[in-house]
Every structure is written in C-alpha cells, then in structure tokens.
Amino acid sequence: MGAYKYMQELWRKKQSDVMRFLLRVRCWQYRQLSALHRAPRPTRPDKARRLGYKAKQGYVIYRIRVRRGGRKRPVPKGATYGKPVHHGVNQIKFARSLQSVAEERAGRHCGGLRVLSSYWVGEDSTYKFFEVVLIDTFHKAIRRDPDTQWITKAVHKHREMRGLTSAGKKSRGLGKGHKFHLTIGGSRRAAWKRRNTLQLHRYR
C-alpha cells in the first residue's frame, strides 16, 4: 500500500483516538478563523488528489464553514402570503446538501476561479467544514495541460451554481447504477412530471 492509501484508511477510522483528537483540535482551530478563508495546502492530500488536485501552480484550496441545520424561509415576520398549505417557515428542508452550499459560496467569492470539487474536513454541533478545490483557468500551467483544458472552456463557468459538481449532482438524482436509472432526461423533476401527467394522444 502506498502512503496515500494509509492516509485514506486513517480518515476512514474517524472513531480512533488519534483522529478523534485531531478532528476536535482542528474544529477548534477552524472556528477561530473566518467563515471563508484560503488554506495554504489541502488538509486531506489523498482526497484532494483523488478529486483532481495537483500540487502545482493554478490550484487553490479554500476552507468554508457552513452552519448546520435546516433552512428557515426568509420572510418578514413569517408572512408568506397565499394559502395555508404554503405557510411553512421553520420546518423547511433545503433541497441541496451543505457541501454544495459551501461550493457555491467559494465560487461566489472567487469569481475568476472555477470550482473543481470539494470534500469534508470536519464538523461539530454547530458547523460543518469543507475544503473546496478551485482552478485558475487563466494560468498557463492549467491552459497548457491536456488534463485540465476542459475546465477552461466558457461552458464551465460557475458550474457549482448549476449543480454540475459532484456534490451538486447528488441532489439532482444523477449518478450511475441501478439507483439512478429512473432519472431519465437528466432531471428528477422532469421524470416525475412525465410520470404524473395524463396524456391522451389523439388517435389518427
């Protein structure tokens, strides 16, 4: 086994004494920092590399702190207007994961960079912490590398806002295997609408 494989196994055993202590200390450290800050290097080099990170120019790591819990509907004094069925304010569940929210915040803050992917680095009772891998698409090291040229194209601008990252695809019902066969047409909503719409075609 290589060094990265050992590192991967360490992160899998989060209940071990070493990891429990490390995660607890790191959570304390991250809480003292701002909600969005640049990390000098990835906390999990093995995970970052599996997602496409390389320790060379053009790659940037940002650490994001996201508050845990459900999403409250942002309405003044709870006035939602409309029918009682839509009066919910507090028990609303957000459709996307906190990880995709972290990616979106990083993408907004660093408008000139492209979000590649992200991974979990810690959590406590109040916050979850993620590290987001971003790429500077105007750097020569990125533009000249055949492996990263795809992300320099304009179609990949703000891919995190459109649910095109790995974390964003999960909430869209997209993936490989038998669990995702029913999401035909690239949208869970479109698939549901097609199944639940009565279509009476004229016989010609």
Curated annotation (Swiss-Prot):
The lineage of its organism: Eukaryota, Metazoa, Chordata, Craniata, Vertebrata. Gene3D superfamilies: Ribosomal protein l15e. Pfam families: Ribosomal_L15e. The gene is rpl15. Belongs to the eukaryotic ribosomal protein eL15 family. GO terms for molecular function: RNA binding; structural constituent of ribosome. It comes from the Eukaryota. GO terms for biological process: cytoplasmic translation. This is Large ribosomal subunit protein eL15. Transmembrane segments: none annotated. Component of the large ribosomal subunit. Keywords: Cytoplasm, Ribonucleoprotein, Ribosomal protein. Component of the large ribosomal subunit. The ribosome is a large ribonucleoprotein complex responsible for the synthesis of proteins in the cell. One of its GO terms (cellular component) is cytosolic large ribosomal subunit. It comes from Cyprinus carpio (Common carp). It is found in: Cytoplasm.
